[in-house]
């Protein structure tokens, strides 16, 4: 197994891409810690969901939160796993959780920065200032916070893999997605800069650039808009979470040891503008 003996942290791992990533890393041999702002057993989950927007409210109220279930499934594979509550915008909490992972598991080798928010599509004049600020805090600063917290542990071991979740919205733009597109473009810039810094410590830093992926969030979207986006892909269909997860396992492995600073499109060719 290509990731045997490695310890991975997946942020935003309770559903969708994060859940698929966690399971795929475990199948490849890694021990996996899942973090999310929503946990099934959290008695304050409804309050947390309300704080972080309509998508989280819907997922929490509909029972579409699987962080602890996913950890159980991973342990049933014979791997070590736990689910921890984490708000990536809280720097002190991020440092505490990453330190706990290292203490409990002995190392912290792989970081998957998947935690993000996208729950509003509005044109510029209707963009709420507080949602702009929130998206920056979660999607971009949250990624920075997690990278900074794990960096010393990876440097100490002389090995590390950081994989950041970007988006075609960050490379192509998105109508009515000024805040989301800006944060994901920022993630790509952060990825390249950290790749340069990490190389001297044998830490690779790459980004996945998903296109239209069949997740809970996608299925919540406007059906006509979803159809238009699907028809722009070369395959004329959405990808599956496992398509992202398989790319992540590759980038986390030594098969990708000479790859860094790369935005890897897993997008079905949506950026090709096929006709």
Model-derived features: positions:
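Short C-terminal tail/terminal secondary-structure segment
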Residues: 121, 172, 232, 249, ...
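Active-site helix of classical SDR
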Residues: 147, 183, 191
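Substrate-binding pocket helix/loop in short-chain dehydrogenase/reductase
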Residues: 94, 122-124, 128-136, 218, ...
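Short-chain dehydrogenase/reductase
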Residues: 1-105, 119-122, 130-131
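Alpha-helical segment proximal to the catalytic Tyr-Lys
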Residues: 152, 196-197, 257
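Residue(s) in the substrate-gating loop at a strand-loop-helix junction
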Residues: 167
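Short, small/polar-rich loop/turn modules that mediate ligand/substrate recognition or access, typified
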Residues: 199, 204, 259-261
